[in-house]
């Protein structure tokens, strides 16, 4: 029987829907006025604060829900390596979607700020790498993952990853976050520490910020060979997808080998009892209504994005 003081699936789903609406309304507004301060408000007030308030009101244990357990230095370093090696994998899946979309029209570059100088670089590392890494992990690998674990660990990891991808509300950046969510979710379970997800998330976003900064530097040195002003066409995207896919295959093997070290170091974690999972199967579909509504919103946003590309 579910403990009323413990976070549950329905509560997490409702909070997910509310946060998604806040992201698309208040988040969009504050980021439109000023990207950097808007991102800070979005991450700390719209994404981090709601789950903290929910757990507090629910009366659950913060350390239990968010897995605020120590992470070995060795595992932290391995996670950094795993994330860097997994970056091409996430990029590959995003490129696959971008390639298909490019057949509809000219795709637009993602609305992510890039650093043009070293001071902007450090500011974006704090905002995009550190802040997003902390706040989003508390929400997804913290609250969402813990709430869904009554359905079994595999289901919890998969569902939280899907919701993580959905939460970006960008068809071009959907599969990448899903893949990363699977990796971060598994690492959090193996280590029983949210810090595993935070380190991984911060590393991934840090790589993205660094690559954007380097591209701007290259453009400045080689103004006649601009490599970022225009988005590539379908043929170029196909070539890029094949190339990145080849790189991802190699780095993926490396990431797996590093992951094996963590698996050997951590105790084998048990899955939920079969009878408990069976009870969840009888759960009312009403519990997942907030997710369905969020999915409808996502589809509408994607429709607007595709319509903009085709026109």
Regions found by a protein language model. Give the residues of each.
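Function-critical hydrophobic alpha-helical transmembrane segments in multi-pass membrane proteins
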Residues: 49, 110-174
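Membrane-interface segments at the starts/ends of alpha-helical transmembrane spans
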Residues: 33-35, 115-117, 224-243
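Membrane-helix interface linkers and caps
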Residues: 2, 41-84, 99-105, 252-275
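Interfacial transmembrane-helix boundary/kink motif in multi-pass membrane proteins
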Residues: 2-18, 62-91, 235-241, 269-295
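Functionally important transmembrane alpha-helices
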Residues: 173-232, 240
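Juxtamembrane helix-loop-helix connectors linking adjacent transmembrane helices
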Residues: 30-31, 35-38, 63-133, 303-311
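Alpha-helical transmembrane segments in multi-pass membrane proteins
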Residues: 20-55, 245-247, 310-311
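Alpha-helical transmembrane segments of multi-pass integral membrane proteins
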Residues: 237-253, 286-310
């Amino acid at each position: 029987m579910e403990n009323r003081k413990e976070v549950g699936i329905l509560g997490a789903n409702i909070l997910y829907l509310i946060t998604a609406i806040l992201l698309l309304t208040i988040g969009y507004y504050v980021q439109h006025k000023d990207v950097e301060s808007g991102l800070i408000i979005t991450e700390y007030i719209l994404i981090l604060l709601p789950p903290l308030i929910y757990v507090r009101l629910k009366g659950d244990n913060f350390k239990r829900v968010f897995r605020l357990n120590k992470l070995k230095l060795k595992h932290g370093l391995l996670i950094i390596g795993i994330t860097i090696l997994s970056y091409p994998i996430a990029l590959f899946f995003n490129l696959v979607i971008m390639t298909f979309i490019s057949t509809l029209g000219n795709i637009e570059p993602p609305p992510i700020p890039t650093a043009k100088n070293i001071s902007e670089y450090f500011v974006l590392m704090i905002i995009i790498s550190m802040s997003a890494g902390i706040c989003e992990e508390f929400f997804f690998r913290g609250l969402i993952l813990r709430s869904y674990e009554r359905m079994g660990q595999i289901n919890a990891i998969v569902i939280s990853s899907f919701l993580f991808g959905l939460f970006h509300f960008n068809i071009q950046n959907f599969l990448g976050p899903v893949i990363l969510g699977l990796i971060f979710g598994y690492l959090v379970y193996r280590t029983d520490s949210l810090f595993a997800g935070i380190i991984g998330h911060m590393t991934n976003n840090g790589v993205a910020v660094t690559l954007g900064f380097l591209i701007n530097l290259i453009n400045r040195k080689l103004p006649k060979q601009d490599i970022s002003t225009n988005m590539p066409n379908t043929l170029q995207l196909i070539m890029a997808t094949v190339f990145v896919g080849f790189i991802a295959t190699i780095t993926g093997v490396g990431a797996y080998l590093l992951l094996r070290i963590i698996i050997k170091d951590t105790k084998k974690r048990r899955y939920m009892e079969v009878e408990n999972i069976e009870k969840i199967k009888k759960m009312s579909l009403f519990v997942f209504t907030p997710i369905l509504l969020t999915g409808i919103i996502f589809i509408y946003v994607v429709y607007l994005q595709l319509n903009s590309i085709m026109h």
